[in-house]
Curated annotation (Swiss-Prot):
The active site is at residues 118, 140. The lineage of its organism: Bacteria, Pseudomonadati, Pseudomonadota, Alphaproteobacteria, Hyphomicrobiales. One of its GO terms (molecular function) is aspartic-type endopeptidase activity. It catalyses: Release of signal peptides from bacterial membrane prolipoproteins. Hydrolyzes -Xaa-Yaa-Zaa-|-(S,diacylglyceryl)Cys-, in which Xaa is hydrophobic (preferably Leu), and Yaa (Ala or Ser) and Zaa (Gly or Ala) have small, neutral side chains. The chain crosses the membrane at residues 6-26, 39-59, 65-85, 88-108, 141-161. It comes from Rhodopseudomonas palustris (strain TIE-1). The gene is lspA. This is Lipoprotein signal peptidase. This protein specifically catalyzes the removal of signal peptides from prolipoproteins. Its main location: membrane. Pfam families: Peptidase_A8 (PF01252). It is a multi-pass membrane protein. Its EC number is 3.4.23.36. It comes from the Bacteria. Pathway: Protein modification; lipoprotein biosynthesis (signal peptide cleavage). Belongs to the peptidase A8 family.
Length: 164
């Protein structure tokens, strides 16, 4: 399999997993109706509509803000796709595919709902006080894992082959 095909396949898998989980939680499981659903002592399913970007930053910017975020995301996806096409390592190609798939997944939400669907919440109780992590989704996980893969590839991965 060529590196570009591997990257595209990775992006498609990340996108499919992201959208499938969101659709199932919204319409099959009906998470909105159920509210907070405890899964373990440290993990809940909870529906959160993120109108901003990461961690809810820039939320409430209205339709103009949404359009600007989508335009920026489209440019970023094209730039990442070009980088992926020129990538020389499998790990970088997979990492870029994960980032692209996650970015497209969240962009689809923004187009369809005007916000990103987040649902995963980790929390811990220490000395009687509960500490929550940010609510996130599969696309967010794909983006973070993709960034970690790129960092590993560029900082620790095999050295690039020198030209003769």
């Amino acid at each position: 399999m060529t590196p570009v095909r591997l990257g595209i396949l990775t992006a498609v898998i990340a996108l499919a997993l992201d959208q499938a989980t969101k659709l199932w939680l919204l319409y099959g499981f009906e998470l909105a109706r159920k509210g907070v659903v405890p899964v373990t002592s440290f993990f809940d399913l909870v529906l959160a509509w993120n109108t901003g970007i990461s961690y809810g930053w820039f939320a409430g910017q209205g339709p103009t803000g949404q359009i600007l975020m989508l335009a920026f995301k489209a440019v970023a996806i094209v730039a990442l796709a070009i980088w992926m096409a020129r990538s020389t390592t499998k790990l970088a190609t997979i990492g870029l595919g994960l980032i692209i798939g996650g970015a497209i997944g969240n962009a689809i939400d923004r187009l369809a709902y005007g916000a990103v669907v987040d649902f995963a919440l980790f929390h811990v109780e220490i000395a009687g006080k509960t500490y929550n992590w940010y609510v996130f989704n599969i696309a967010d996980v794909a983006i973070v894992v993709g960034v970690v893969a790129l960092l590993y590839d560029s900082l620790i991965g095999a050295p690039a082959v020198k030209a003769p």
